[in-house]
Design a protein with these regions (language model features):
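Active-site region of chymotrypsin-like
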Residues: 42-48, 53-55, 60, 122-132, ...
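Bacterial N-terminal signal peptides
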Residues: 15-26
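Gly/Ser-rich catalytic serine loop of serine hydrolases
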Residues: 63-72, 130-136, 152, 181-185
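Bacterial N-terminal signal peptides that target proteins for export
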Residues: 2-17
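Conserved active-site neighborhood of the chymotrypsin/trypsin-like protease fold
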Residues: 52, 75-157
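Residue-level preference for beta-strand/loop junctions
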Residues: 65, 99, 156, 178-180
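N-terminal activation segment of mature serine protease catalytic domains
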Residues: 31-72, 79-82, 91, 140, ...
Length: 185
């Protein structure tokens, strides 16, 4: 075999190896993008109409106000959210990511002490194209994390990436209790 033939074969092998490597990176990127899309689709915007009790005249309610918050689809066709999002709610709606339609929802469980609540949507098919997100282990400090949600004042999904710099007990305003909280930098 001549030097030119060996050079051509080795160039072809290197070309195939580079192409295969790029393909692997593309597949990994595609898998990562589809996983991110599934997470984004499983984050729900929650709209509520709330009427808190008037503690000075307990037979009356304060004027209703509207607010919004975030929730995540979990197993059992449930949406996990914070109790402060649905506390004193007389009307609850859920809106999927990139879907203008709002669906009537109802609270199925609330724990003010843990500031957690479960809601569901009875509309047939609401959960059919959504992936239930699992509840994982507590991340380690210095681990990169992503936070998805609809913070106050935002109409579109917010995604924040950062490093979990610490996890410690902090007082939660809703329950006036010490619970675990993480700081992301």
């Amino acid at each position: 075999m001549s030097y030119n033939n060996i050079r051509t074969i080795s160039t072809q092998v290197i070309g195939i190896a580079v192409t295969a490597t790029c393909l692997l990176f593309s597949l990994a990127s595609f898998a990562q993008n589809s996983e991110m899309q599934a997470i984004e689709d499983s984050v729900i915007k929650i709209y509520t109409t709330q009427a808190a009790p008037d503690y000075f005249t307990p037979w009356r309610l304060l004027n209703p106000r509207q607010s919004s918050g975030s929730g995540s689809v979990i197993a059992g066709n449930q949406i996990l959210t914070n109790a402060h999002v649905v506390a004193n709610a007389s009307y609850v709606q859920a809106q999927k990511h990139n879907d203008p339609q709002r669906y009537q929802a109802r609270v199925t469980f609330i724990s003010h002490e843990a500031d957690l609540a479960l809601i569901t949507v009875d509309e047939p098919g609401f959960f059919s194209d959504l992936t239930a997100l699992g509840i994982g282990a507590l991340p380690d400090p210095h681990e990169e994390v992503s936070v998805y949600g609809y913070p106050m004042g935002g109409k579109t999904l917010s995604i924040t990436k950062g490093i979990l710099s610490r996890v410690e007990q902090q007082i939660y305003a809703h329950a006036d209790a010490f619970l675990l909280a993480g700081q992301i930098d």
